[in-house]
Amino acid sequence: MATQLQREISNLKKSILTLSALVEDNLRRALTAVETHDETLAAAAIDRDFPIDLMEVDIEEDCLKALALYQPVDGDLRFIVTIIKINGTLERVGDLAVNIAERALQLAAAPQPVVSFDMTGMAIKAQQMVSNSLDALVASDAAAARAVLLADDEIDDLDREFTARLNAAAREHPEWLEGVVQLLQISRFIERLADHATSIAEDVIYMVEGEIPRHSVKRAVAEAMGFNGAVPPRAKE
């Protein structure tokens, strides 16, 4: 039974790595289409989402089957639960790639706003966060996963800065409005990519250490406030 479970875990590792490669490849395709205004590349990114969706379903079914047949515990259980969660997150990253590609098609046909901002740089940073979170998964590296968490605030700041500059450009040049709208959406999608990378990194930390990072932050805040795990008293009316 244990040998069969380890064989299933090995197969799940291979499957999630294959899905990761498909998602990263299509994300690069979509972001390149935005940068180059390549409508053919954008259309290809949209078309290549279907195999990603199919594989996500297959991986989830394999995970549920392993849980039912082998009833794993401890590290094996955490691994399978983590794969279920990351599998779903990767599917959402794939959907974002499609959303970006669709906006790239509309942007290519719209007046191009002239904005002093490196959107490509922001996209590369978010894409690198996704890649680094998946590398942390492959290596079971909690430290590398924590480094991904630290990068999220920078993407949030860049998104806010780009949004402000786009809004200013739209006010000064109403003729750019359609292009501004598409870029605003693309910027928001890039910010969500970073959020998904953060989610994957948190799941890796849970898999390796059994610790849910967002709960550990809440616990630290509670301890600093003197709650020490106890339910705080209700205020008197």
Question: Language-model segments: what does each one mean?
Answer:
Residues 1-237:
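Cytosolic, long alpha-helical scaffolding segments
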